[in-house]
Amino acid sequence: MAEKSREERKQNVIEVLNEARAMELHAIYQYMNQHYGLDDMDYGELAKNIKLVAIDEMRHAEMFAERIKELGGEPVAESTEKVQRAQEAGQIFKHDSMLEDTTIDKYNEFLLVCRENGDSISVKLFEQIIEEEQEHLGYFENISDHLENLGSAYLARIAGTPASTGGFSKGFISGQGAE
């Protein structure tokens, strides 16, 4: 079997970077939709933290786009899936846990593609983003567990809390949300 050309290897990496970017775009749309819904339900603290996670996902999407451009590719601008709308508070965090878990699995696969194609910079990018996605997963699982175990008592504690993230927000990871 002939060795892949440098251009073929680069295209393989661009392909997984674009797939990851599309996944991030979906997460942004999904989490912002949930932010608005939770804010409307008056669960400000939960709305705020989901918005901060969405901001992290925006940063991830931008990081993938920059790497794609460095490799000579064109970053995708479309999401991979449709947004789940009108979710109940209890559904949101189970859904988001599954979304993050799937993302982590896919990114680990993409990392291997980058490694197999000799792109250590993209490998490091995926490692960094996977670490942040694992923090998001931990947060979503924690809230999901609280909702499952405490139900309306937990939501009553959250009701009426502010949803504002302030003027400029660094995101969930950079701003150390859910402290």
Question: PLM features: residue spans?
Answer:
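Iron-associated oxidoreductase/ferritin-like identity signal
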Residues: 1-179
